[in-house]
Amino acid sequence: MRVNPDELTKVIEERIKSYESGEIKEIGWVMQVSDGIVRAYGLKDVMTNELVEIETSEGEKIYGIAMNLEEDNVGIITLGDYKGIKEGDKLVRTNRIIEVPVGEKLLGRVVNPLGMPLDGKGEINTDDFYPIERKAMGVVTRKPVDTPLQTGLKVLDALIPIGRGQRELIIGDRQTGKTAIATDTIINQKGKNVFCIYVSIGQKSSGLARTIDNLEKYGAMDYTVVVAADASDPASLQYIAPYAGAAIGEYFMFNGKDALVIYDDLTKHAAAYREISLLLRRPPGREAYPGDIFYLHSRLLERASRLNENYGNGSLTALPIIETQANDISAYIPTNVISITDGQIYLETGLFNAGIRPAVNIGLSVSRVGGDAQTKAMKRVAGSLKLDLAQYRELESFTQFAADLDEATKKQLTKGEKLTELMKQPQYSPMEMEEQVAVIYAANEGYLDQIPTDRISDFERQFLAYLKENYRDTLNKIRESKDIADEIKKELNEAISKFLNVFR
């Protein structure tokens, strides 16, 4: 029997074609599991921070992140309940870094750091996914901060202005109003085309529920995404939460829009990372934090930026929050974040308890780049305000020891008291820029000298109502021109004089 080589070749080719090429997967096995950390062997080519799929003996799939790449094993943090994982379970590489869903379909939703909904409003159907870790945009892609981000709070917009693309730290002890400033800022973005991302890290569920309830009450959830990793969530989820929030914010920035992301708070984020690092047996450093704790926050906050025209003109503003112990801003994490950010808003327990709210310490608070973004109108009226208030606080502490004071000091103290009273503002009542300018202008021109200190808040409320009713055009001119020309000053002087005749 003669074999035809051509026929044989044809049969072999057909057989080869009939085989389905299987997907090549790199697998490993669990050696040890404890406290949410899995030690595995195999996975020789796994990347750092790569997403790994763990298949339990019950058929359940649990995801983890490869954090420690050692010679003979890989240290993996699990993103969920690790109790079903046993020694010998199989692991599979995914060949990708962890990603989160992004886009406008997330607005109004509460999600966990993996982008899974927590609000019971159904699935989020979006086609866009961003990696949670991304290299910050380079210097050539950026432009200087030049547009204000109005918080609606007089004391901040006048004295510690924030620009779009800035990183401004909110720092203070517990219960000093840090989250209140953040939520007021979100509420004030209504109608200003700024998309907000509120990242809750290690907070109590009751506190988070209250914040979400307030955002819904004031219509702020329409343009806000809440990323929540509360105190009961594993440290791994608390660790990735701010990066997920930054990725959601970057989507808006890369699409030429303005976004604001609030990290509440990075003290708990650092504690979660310390917990993970110690469980992975990484060497501890100062205050038991690992050596790369600075890089943890710098790579996160550097992602906030103001892009130039060639890259879409978008911006991502970051307001990280840090909780101090006994007003100690010289501790490790506070000093790290202060050195990374473009300024800080320092809230003081003493001021808060004295009823001065927002409890901003003017002397220790600063905005390094926000002044360039401040409107001309606000710059003109708020010029000497910060100095006056800082000097008043200094004088006030000295006068506790002095019995008799000269007239000039008494006058300065009275002025300082009235300005401090004017800077007070109730929560959930943000003010428009033109209203702030009008009120501060009245103080600068000495019109408050004849008003008793305890009537300042009444004066402000009634004066703004009077302006809206009788001088709406003047307010519109300030808003549109963003300046306070001589003509506007003349109209404001006329308005204040007329109002003082009817003020009671």
Curated annotation (Swiss-Prot):
Residues binding ATP: G172, D173, R174, Q175, T176, G177, K178, T179
Class of enzymatic activity (EC top level): translocase
Name listed for the protein in its UniProt record: ATP synthase subunit alpha
Q: How does it sit in the membrane?
A: Peripheral membrane protein
Describe its assembly.
F-type ATPases have 2 components, CF(1) - the catalytic core - and CF(0) - the membrane proton channel. CF(1) has five subunits: alpha(3), beta(3), gamma(1), delta(1), epsilon(1). CF(0) has three main subunits: a(1), b(2) and c(9-12). The alpha and beta chains form an alternating ring which encloses part of the gamma chain. CF(1) is attached to CF(0) by a central stalk formed by the gamma and epsilon chains, while a peripheral stalk is formed by the delta and b chains.
Return one GO MF term: ATP binding
The entry's family comment says:
Belongs to the ATPase alpha/beta chains family.
The record lists the catalysed reaction(s) as:
ATP + H2O + 4 H(+)(in) = ADP + phosphate + 5 H(+)(out)
Q: Which Pfam families match?
A: ATP-synt_ab (PF00006), ATP-synt_ab_C (PF00306), ATP-synt_ab_N (PF02874)
Q: Which organism is it from?
A: Petrotoga mobilis (strain DSM 10674 / SJ95)
Enzyme Commission code: 7.1.2.2
Q: What's the domain of life for this entry?
A: Bacteria
| UniProt cross-references to PROSITE patterns, sorted A to Z | ATPASE_ALPHA_BETA
